[in-house]
């Protein structure tokens, strides 16, 4: 049995990425304050369809993701279909794979095309850190259910008397892993300590990311993949990511105090991604259908892989496990790649993964391979800047990486690129893209 992955349909046609688009990414409680993930999702899918000049009725399936879900609209994908002029019979369902969510939605659409179930589909993801499902305490939730069963005033009063003042306080969404109680930042701090990632190296990576992202925006190339978002009540708009430090100064990074280990830590707000609002979407088709409709795809999916590892240590090392799987399925080595895009959740996490890529010991002990994945050539790595600068709306980041990679390879005359991300729960994703 071959290790190669056949990312084609029964006719041998490749899975074409026709176009990709995203909203600007905005820091929490700024430009998209009060705008839900659903509204941003509808916004970007509408604009994607408009720019593609595709009849919405031709879309056969939409798979969309959201990490911080709103109880009022648990199936964000179906709501997007109903809010964007697509046929009401269009199949739609929602997925979540933490920070790799839009990798998952993309793969789901690709696999639907591979099996012949559809020819045209849309994938993507959206998240809002500004519109959050604020909950109630367990005791209050229990009491509210009991109140629905109480028949007399006395019974209701007895239920209220069980509650204290603190039981009435709102409960924000958890920022820690359910299974471990550890936050992503605490895991990044652990990885920095375990793998000897210095504060100086983390700050240097953040500075590099912001500098390259600022240069990329200044060059004008991002305008083709980032829409202008008009924010309700439509008296203002946002046209650019607002987390990027336009004049990043490396010396200024050293002034910030560590966040997750204030005494001995190295992970700061500046070398971590901020809480971010945003949405992204991809239009995918079978190669034959894309050409029949007159489209020139921006890229094709060559291979993909997902990995799952232990959550107690090095939980954000997913790229180091998923990447060798995707490379093997593509029949490639790391040095064969033209470009590499790795999600920078934290500088510490990205640097730790890069270190493991180059480690023969890691390959032997963790991957069962006799050679390292490979040392990353920094001239190929996150050449337009990364998540540290652009921000990270959890479910939207994967599609950003895919779109950005395809467009940059196209500008360079084609090639093959790796996109990869870590994710909460010890998950990892990798996708190899080819561009002509």
UniProtKB/Swiss-Prot annotation:
Coiled coil as UniProt keyword: no
GO BP annotation list: fatty acid beta-oxidation
SUPFAM superfamilies: Thiolase-like
Subcellular location: Cytoplasm
Pathway linked to the protein: Lipid metabolism; fatty acid beta-oxidation
Family: Belongs to the thiolase-like superfamily. Thiolase family.
Description of how the protein assembles with itself and partners: Heterotetramer of two alpha chains (FadJ) and two beta chains (FadI).
Designated name of the protein: 3-ketoacyl-CoA thiolase
């Amino acid at each position: 049995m071959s290790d190669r992955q056949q990312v084609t349909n029964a006719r041998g046609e490749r899975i074409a990425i026709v176009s990709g688009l995203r909203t600007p990414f905005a820091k929490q409680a700024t430009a998209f304050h009060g705008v839900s993930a659903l509204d941003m999702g509808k916004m970007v899918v509408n604009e994607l369809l408009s720019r593609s000049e595709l009849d919405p009725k031709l879309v056969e399936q939409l798979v969309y993701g959201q990490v911080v879900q709103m109880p009022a609209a648990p199936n964000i994908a179906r709501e997007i279909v109903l809010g964007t002029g697509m046929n009401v019979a269009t199949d739609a369902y929602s997925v979540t794979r933490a920070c790799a969510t839009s990798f998952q939605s993309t793969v789901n659409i690709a696999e639907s095309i591979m099996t012949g179930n559809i020819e045209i589909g849309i994938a993507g993801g959206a998240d809002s850190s500004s519109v959050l499902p604020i909950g109630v305490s367990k005791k209050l939730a229990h009491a509210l259910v009991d109140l629905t069963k109480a028949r007399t005033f006395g019974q209701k009063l007895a239920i209220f008397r069980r509650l204290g003042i603190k039981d009435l306080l709102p409960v924000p969404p958890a920022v820690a892993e359910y299974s471990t109680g550890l936050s992503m930042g605490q895991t990044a701090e652990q990885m920095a300590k375990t793998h000897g990632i210095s504060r100086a190296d983390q700050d240097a990576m953040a500075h590099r990311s912001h500098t390259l992202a600022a240069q990329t925006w200044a060059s004008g190339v991002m305008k083709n993949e980032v829409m202008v978002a008009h924010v309700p009540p439509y008296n203002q708009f946002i046209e650019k990511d607002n987390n990027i430090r336009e004049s990043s100064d490396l010396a200024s990074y050293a002034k910030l105090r560590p966040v997750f280990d204030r005494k001995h830590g190295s992970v700061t707000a500046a070398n971590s991604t901020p809480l971010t609002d945003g949405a992204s979407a991809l239009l995918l088709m079978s190669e034959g259908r894309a050409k029949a409709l007159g489209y020139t795809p921006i890229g094709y999916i060559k291979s993909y892989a997902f990995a799952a590892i232990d959550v107690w240590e090095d939980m954000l090392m997913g790229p180091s496990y998923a990447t060798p799987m995707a490379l093997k399925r593509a029949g490639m080595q790391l040095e064969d790649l033209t470009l590499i895009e790795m999600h920078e959740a934290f500088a510490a996490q990205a640097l730790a993964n890069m270190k493991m890529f180059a480690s023969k010991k890691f390959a032997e002990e963790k991957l069962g391979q006799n050679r390292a994945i490979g040392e990353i050539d920094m001239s190929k790595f996150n050449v337009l800047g990364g998540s540290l600068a652009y921000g990270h709306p959890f479910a939207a980041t994967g599609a950003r990486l895919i779109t950005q990679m395809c467009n940059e390879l196209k500008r360079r005359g084609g090639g093959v690129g790796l996109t990869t991300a870590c994710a909460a729960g010890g998950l990892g994703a990798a996708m190899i893209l080819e561009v002509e």
